[in-house]
């Protein structure tokens, strides 16, 4: 989807809106971390004799005089081989070669951005990998973006008819249908197009939703409507993914399943380093490199 021209100008209470968004993202982070730790505690199948994982939080600040920072929350456990739930709030100026690509930054390079980003690589190949992020960006304009997508790593489960796929899609659809500013069909298509490895001519997973540059008019509800939708995307994810994990995490798997999982993880690496907009944005804005690249899986195999 082509980047639209967004209206220039910010509301008088933009600082209050920034604070509200940041508080939401950080609260969602804490909710998800607690939910994932509970999953670690409740495992009864393979590897249940190991100690359950716990998140380790690490705060970071931007260097070289740039503003803001964030918190990395990483866990390596018996259910989640590697999961990162990160929040950041950063501000400063875009580099000259990046300004024209960002709405409202061509003539004024100042920006502020806050968001949450999550990626989970489970141990059990029966449990799909997942990615979710939502964010608010302010230049001389303002907008929300984000989404969530599911990646089953076993080919027999990587279908639209699989119960995990249908459950995930339904949760994202409900989150969209409850908000007039959201367009589920467009966001689902956008996700399918975005999370596609062109060099392999294949999808990364089974999809989900993806949206960006969400800036609704005051007549349509404005910032409040956009923020309400973004919150519901986070809530939908926090409800549906733990349910999917719990329905699969006690199942047995084979060495062949593990091999297939590691090969599928390679597709994650390829996408994130070649195409991912969030990775590029983070590196271009002086983000925390360790946090940005923490989305990469811990063990990968290429055939």
UniProtKB/Swiss-Prot annotation:
The entry's keywords: Cytoplasm, Heme biosynthesis, Metal-binding, Oxidoreductase, Porphyrin biosynthesis
Q: Where is the active site?
A: 131 (proton donor)
Record GO terms (molecular function)? coproporphyrinogen oxidase activity; metal ion binding; protein homodimerization activity
Q: Which residues bind substrate?
A: 117, 133-135, 286-288
Superkingdom of origin organism: Bacteria
Q: Which InterPro entries match?
A: Coprogen_oxidase_aer (IPR001260), Coprogen_oxidase_aer_sf (IPR036406), Coprogen_oxidase_CS (IPR018375)
- What is known about its subunit structure? Homodimer.
Instruction: Please describe what this protein does.
Output: Involved in the heme biosynthesis. Catalyzes the aerobic oxidative decarboxylation of propionate groups of rings A and B of coproporphyrinogen-III to yield the vinyl groups in protoporphyrinogen-IX.
Descriptive protein name = Oxygen-dependent coproporphyrinogen-III oxidase
| Organism name | Rhizobium johnstonii (strain DSM 114642 / LMG 32736 / 3841)
Per the record, the gene is hemF
């Amino acid at each position: 989807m082509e980047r639209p021209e967004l209206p220039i100008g910010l509301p008088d209470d933009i600082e209050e809106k920034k604070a509200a968004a940041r508080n939401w993202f950080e609260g969602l982070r804490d909710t998800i971390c607690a939910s994932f730790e509970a999953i670690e505690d409740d495992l009864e199948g393979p590897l249940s004799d190991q100690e359950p994982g716990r998140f380790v939080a690490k705060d970071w600040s931007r260097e070289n005089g740039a503003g803001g920072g964030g918190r990395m929350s990483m866990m390596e456990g018996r259910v989640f081989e590697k999961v990162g739930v990160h929040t950041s709030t950063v501000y400063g100026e875009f580099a000259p070669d990046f300004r024209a690509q960002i709405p409202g930054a061509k003539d004024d390079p100042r920006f502020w951005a806050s968001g949450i980003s999550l990626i989970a690589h489970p141990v059990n190949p029966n449990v799909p990998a997942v990615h979710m992020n939502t964010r608010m960006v302010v230049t001389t304009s303002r907008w929300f973006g984000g989404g969530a997508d599911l990646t089953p790593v076993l080919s027999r489960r990587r279908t639209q008819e699989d119960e995990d796929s249908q459950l995930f899609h339904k949760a994202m659809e409900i989150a969209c249908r409850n908000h007039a500013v959201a367009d589920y069909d467009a966001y689902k298509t956008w996700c399918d197009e975005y999370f596609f490895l062109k060099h392999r001519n294949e999808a990364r997973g089974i999809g989900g939703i993806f949206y960006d540059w969400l800036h609704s008019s005051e007549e349509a509800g404005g910032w409040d409507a956009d923020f309400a939708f973004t919150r519901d995307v986070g809530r939908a994810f926090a409800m549906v993914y733990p349910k999917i994990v719990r329905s699969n995490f006690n199942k047995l798997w084979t060495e062949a399943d593990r091999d297939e999982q590691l090969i599928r993880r390679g597709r994650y690496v390829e996408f994130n380093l070649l195409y991912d907009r969030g990775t590029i944005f983070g590196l271009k804005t002086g983000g925390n490199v360790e946090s940005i690249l923490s989305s990469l899986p811990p063990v990968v195999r290429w055939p």
